[in-house]
Amino acid sequence: MRIEDLRKEDWKLNERLEYLAKRGEILEEEYEKSVKEILKRVREEGDRAVIEFTKKFDGVELTPENMEVPFEELEKAYEEIEPEVREALEFAENRIRVFHEKQLENSFFKEEEGIILGQKVVPLEKVGVYVPGGKAAYPSTVLMNVVPASVAGVEEIIMVSPKPNKYTLAAAYIAGVSRVFQVGGAQAIGALAYGTEKIPKVDKIVGPGNIYVALAKKLVFGTVDIDMIAGPSEVLVIADERANPTWVAADMLSQAEHDELAASILLTPSEELANKVKEEVERLLSQLERKEIAQKSLEKFGTIFLVKDLYHACEVANYIAPEHLEVMVREPMALLPELKHAGAIFLGDYTTEPLGDYVLGPNHTLPTGGSTRFFSPLGVYDFIKRSSVLYVSREGFKRVANQAEAIAKAEGLTAHALAVKVRKND
């Protein structure tokens, strides 16, 4: 794991920093052509293309008849998993539900002398949830994506996941998924966006995935809505000299094991801590079941940056705009006002990112690749839409007609002005 020095006035010119800050753009250029081809074929060929790509990328032989997982399999998985895992998933589901219920919006109406104005809030009808599979299975991702949709009142929740295991299926049962299809990758995103013979077209697609999934979501946006660009995972840790190097290293490795394209970054003003964390990462790496994946991730995107002080660390963190931001310093609350761009901010030594992944309650589906500058964590608000509601009586019309007509004439829209004028004589 490399150590870079940013304690200079021109720190933004550091090549490694620029590489990490712009990694979303770099990855897109590399994979976009193949993703476009996959989407094109799914749109034109439907299930046939989905089945072909599933065999090619996942090594799974599908037919139109077995693409959908029978609901009985979800119930069976729920009953078969270990009692402690079932209890943990139900515990997490409840905490996630309670947190997200606070995000619910209500319709409102305001009345004023012949005019009623308001906003009607309604849930989306049909949503697609992508849950990663393959190299790892994520029942927690099922809960984090499905529960907010359930809280919002979405009528039909369609889940897609390549080779879902019993824990993923059990979580789908607990969270209230409507239907499950065992497909993944860009082909699954295309199927949800365009619809196939078996997989229904949805109104919105949510959920994290690899670079193929993230790019596919970006490319189908407009045909359907999406939650965000949630690609390979990232963690950035700000730590001072008193931070525990083993804890810091463990938290960095917890992201590196996700994906070979995951990024693990440390910002610290302490050279001593930087060297100790580097040693601990190397020591702990050998203990991981997924050490090969973590090793490749660290080689590509793992970096320790030396900074001038903690406020400089905040400036660098805002420049990178990470998915997960951990603050392991003596007074973490003091830095919170300085932190502008992060999907989730974990304050304090004990607030390790995996707690947020699983059981705390706030959503773990977060924007990546620098998109925390304009995207927010997944929430109930992603599964609702708003319609403006307007009512004007004859009396209310007289209060606003002249002004509306004047603006219409100024814009040269005579039919607009006429629509107002013809009502004045009533």
From Swiss-Prot:
Its EC number is 1.1.1.23. The active site is at 323 (proton acceptor), 324 (proton acceptor). One of its GO terms (molecular function) is NAD binding. PROSITE patterns: HISOL_DEHYDROGENASE. HAMAP family: HisD. Pathway: Amino-acid biosynthesis; L-histidine biosynthesis; L-histidine from 5-phospho-alpha-D-ribose 1-diphosphate: step 9/9. This is Histidinol dehydrogenase. PANTHER family: HISTIDINE BIOSYNTHESIS TRIFUNCTIONAL PROTEIN, HISTIDINOL DEHYDROGENASE HDH. NCBIfam families: hisD (TIGR00069). NAD(+) binds at residues 130, 187, 210. It is an enzyme of class 1 (oxidoreductase). It comes from Aquifex aeolicus (strain VF5). Its cofactor is Zn(2+). The keyword Zinc applies. It comes from the Bacteria. The keyword Ubl conjugation does not apply. It holds the Pfam family Histidinol_dh. One of its GO terms (cellular component) is cytosol. It catalyses: L-histidinol + 2 NAD(+) + H2O = L-histidine + 2 NADH + 3 H(+). Catalyzes the sequential NAD-dependent oxidations of L-histidinol to L-histidinaldehyde and then to L-histidine.
